[in-house]
Curated annotation (Swiss-Prot):
Sequence segments annotated as region (Disordered): 1-37, 508-552
Primary enzyme class: hydrolase
Location relative to the cell: Cytoplasm; Nucleus
CDD domains: DEADc_DDX5_DDX17 (cd17966), SF2_C_DEAD (cd18787)
Protein name per its UniProtKB record: ATP-dependent RNA helicase DBP2
Enzyme Commission numbers on file: 3.6.4.13
Species name: Mycosarcoma maydis (Corn smut fungus)
C-alpha cells in the first residue's frame, strides 16, 4: 500500500521554497476493523465528501467542551498498521541559522538563556534567536509581527522557533501568557507552505489539539492573522455547537484544524474528515487536556497520524502524565523550560490573600471594585460554581456594577457575546467559573479576584495568570476562608516562591494541618464577562437583569 505518488501541479510559494506537487490518485484505502482508513476515499483521488449542509440552527450546546470527553468516542477507530504503509516523504526542516546567531559564542548563548530562566534538554539544540529577523520568517509573517508592535521574541518563542523550524519534535514548558500560541503557529505556516496543496477529500496538514473551545477559537484567530496572506484556511472543531458548519468547513478543505479531542474523534469516526495529510501536530496545554480526561481520545487521535510527523507539545507544567505522553509519541525531542517546571505563579502578578469569612466576601468585593473602577481596569471574578457565578452577577448588576457571567450552562452564542463585551471594555467585570482560567486570552486584564478559593492550587495559579500577561503587571485578590485551610501549605509555597507577602493567618493554618489541598483535577467550567444594555447574544439568567444606578 502507499499514499500514491506525487502528480504534477505546483505547491505554495514563499521564502522557504516552492513546495511540491500535489498527491496523485492512489486507490488503496486502509482496512481497519471493517472501516476503511479515510472513509472510502483514496488519498488524492476520488470524490470529496459533499457539502456538509447545516447551518447555525439548532440549540447551542451547554457544557464546557460540549461533553466530548464524556462519551466512548472513536470506538470504531482501529490503530493503523503504519509498518505496512509506504509513506510519501515530506519536508519539515526549513531552518537556516542567521549569521548573527551563528557568530554568538557558547558563553553568550548561556548568558541569554540564563537571563530568560531558560533550560534546555536534548541533543543538537539550536541556539536561540534574539530578534524576529534572526528567525528567518518570510516577509508576510514579519510584516504581521511588526504590526502587532512586539519589540522582541518572548523567551519561549526565541528558542521554540529554531527548534520547530528545524523539524524537531519539541516539548515547551512555560507559564500561561508567555506567547506560546505564536511559538507554534508561525512555524506551522512555514511548514504548510512547503507541502503539496490540498486535494478534494484531504484532511488538514497542521492539527492543533486544545482543551477547550474558547482556546480553540483564540488559536484560530492568531492563525488567521498570520496565515491570511498565503490564503491558508483554518477551521475550529469543538463540541457544544452544531456539527453542520464544522463539517462544511472541513470538507471545503482547511490546511489548519484546531480541535478539541472529543469532537475531532467524532468527525474522524463519522468519516467527515481524515488525518492522512497531518504532518505537523501540536498539543497545546497538554497538561490541561490530561486534567480534563482527554488522554484516551488523544491517544486514539495520534494513532491515526503518520508516525514520522513533527510533534510539538506545549504545557504550563510537566507532571508525570504529560511526560509519559511525550515519551510515547514524540521522537528524539528537544525540550525547553522557561522558569521552573514545578507549579509556580507568574511573578508579574501581585498576589494579595485576604483571610475572611464567607459572610464578609461581598463587602470586600465591593471595596475592591470601587478601587478598580477608579482606574478603569478590567477584572475577572472567579467563583467555585455556576450557581455562585449567577447569584453574584445578579447581586452586582442590581447594585449598579456592569457584570456579566459566563460558564458551561450558557449557550455558545451568549458566551461569545459576553467575551466580546468584555474585550471591548463595554463590560469590564466578568464573573466566571474555573475552567475559563485556561481558555481566556485577553491581554489587558488588570485584576483577578478569586471570590472562592479553587479546589486545587493548580487552578489558583492559572486563574491569577489571567492578569500580568505579555510582560504587563497585574494584581490578584484572593478571599481565603477557614474552610480553605487544607490548601494553606501549598499556597504558602506558591507565595514564597514568588516572593509575595504571606498573611500571618495563612502561616498558622499551614502549621496546624493546612496541607494537602492537592493539585488534583477539577471538572468545573465556564467563564463570563460584560455589561448589560448592549443587546445581542440572547442574554439569560443573571445576565438579563438590568444594571441599577451605575457605580462604574
Amino acid at each position: 500500500m502507499s499514499y500514491g505518488g506525487y502528480s504534477g501541479g505546483s505547491g505554495r510559494g514563499g521564502s522557504y521554497g516552492g513546495g511540491r506537487g500535489g498527491y496523485g490518485g492512489g486507490s488503496s484505502s486502509y482496512g481497519n476493523g471493517g472501516s476503511s482508513y479515510g472513509g472510502g476515499s483514496s488519498y488524492g483521488g476520488g470524490s470529496s465528501y459533499g457539502n456538509g449542509g447545516g447551518g447555525y440552527g439548532g440549540g447551542y450546546g451547554g457544557g464546557y467542551g460540549g461533553g466530548d470527553r464524556m462519551s466512548n468516542l472513536g470506538s470504531n477507530l482501529g490503530a493503523v498498521d503504519w509498518n505496512s504503509v509506504n509513506l510519501v516523504p515530506f519536508e519539515k526542516n526549513f531552518y537556516v541559522e542567521d549569521p548573527r546567531v551563528s557568530n554568538r559564542s557558547d558563553s553568550e548563548v548561556q548568558q541569554y538563556r540564563a537571563s530568560k530562566q531558560m533550560t534546555i534538554q536534548g541533543q543538537n539544540v539550536p541556539k536561540p534567536v534574539t530578534s524576529f529577523d534572526e528567525a528567518g520568517f518570510p516577509d508576510y509573517i514579519l510584516s504581521e509581527i511588526k504590526k502587532m508592535g512586539f519589540s522582541e521574541p518572548s523567551a519561549i518563542q526565541s528558542q521554540a522557533w529554531p527548534m520547530a523550524l528545524s523539524g524537531r519534535d519539541l516539548v515547551a514548558i512555560a507559564e500561561t501568557g508567555s506567547g506560546k500560541t505564536i511559538g507554534f503557529a508561525l512555524p506551522a505556516m512555514v511548514h504548510i507552505n512547503a507541502q503539496p496543496l490540498l486535494k478534494p477529500g484531504d484532511g488538514p496538514i497542521a492539527l492543533i489539539l486544545a482543551p477547550t473551545r474558547e482556546l480553540a477559537n483564540q488559536i484560530q484567530v492568531e492563525c488567521n492573522r498570520f496565515g491570511g496572506s498565503s490564503r491558508l484556511r483554518t477551521c475550529a472543531v469543538y463540541g457544544g455547537v452544531p456539527k453542520g458548519p464544522q463539517i462544511r468547513d472541513l470538507q471545503r478543505g482547511a490546511e489548519i484544524c484546531i480541535a478539541t479531542p472529543g469532537r475531532l474523534i467524532d468527525m474522524v469516526d463519522a468519516g467527515k474528515t481524515n488525518l492522512r495529510r497531518v504532518t505537523y501536530l501540536v498539543m497545546d496545554e497538554a497538561d490541561r487536556m490530561l486534567d480534563m480526561g482527554f488522554e484516551p481520545q488523544i491517544r486514539k487521535i495520534l494513532q491515526q497520524i503518520r508516525p514520522d510527523r513533527q510533534t510539538l507539545m506545549f504545557s504550563a507544567t510537566w507532571p508525570k502524565e504529560v511526560q509519559r505522553l511525550a515519551g510515547d509519541f514524540l521522537n528524539n525531542y528537544a525540550q525547553v523550560n522557561i522558569g521552573s517546571t514545578e507549579l509556580a505563579a507568574n511573578h508579574n502578578v501581585k498576589q494579595i490573600i485576604e483571610v475572611c469569612t464567607e459572610f464578609e466576601k461581598k463587602g470586600k468585593l465591593i471595596g475592591h471594585l470601587e478601587t478598580i473602577s477608579a482606574e478603569n481596569g478590567k477584572v475577572i471574578i472567579f467563583t467555585s460554581t455556576k450557581r455562585v457565578a449567577d447569584d453574584l452577577t445578579k447581586f452586582l448588576r442590581q447594585d449598579g456594577w456592569p457584570a456579566l457571567a459566563i460558564h458551561g450552562d450558557k449557550q455558545q452564542q451568549e458566551r461569545d457575546w459576553v467575551l466580546a463585551e468584555f474585550k471591548s471594555g463595554r463590560s469590564p467585570i466578568m464573573v466566571a467559573t474555573a475552567v475559563a482560567s485556561r481558555g481566556l486570552d485577553v491581554k489587558d486584564i488588570s485584576y483577578v479576584i478569586n471570590y472562592d478559593f479553587p479546589t486545587n492550587t493548580e487552578d489558583y495559579v492559572h486563574q491569577i495568570g489571567r492578569t500580568g500577561r505579555a510582560g504587563r503587571t497585574g494584581t490578584a485578590y484572593t478571599y481565603f476562608t477557614p474552610e480553605n485551610s487544607k490548601s494553606a501549605r501549598e499556597l504558602i509555597g506558591i507565595l514564597r516562591e514568588a516572593k509575595q507577602e504571606i498573611p500571618r493567618e495563612i502561616e498558622e493554618m499551614g502549621r496546624f494541618g493546612g496541607g494537602g489541598g492537592g493539585r488534583g483535577f477539577r471538572g468545573g467550567r465556564g467563564r463570563g464577562r460584560g455589561r448589560g444594555g448592549y443587546g445581542g447574544g440572547g442574554r439569560t439568567g443573571a445576565n438579563s437583569f438590568a444594571v441599577g444606578n451605575s457605580r462604574w
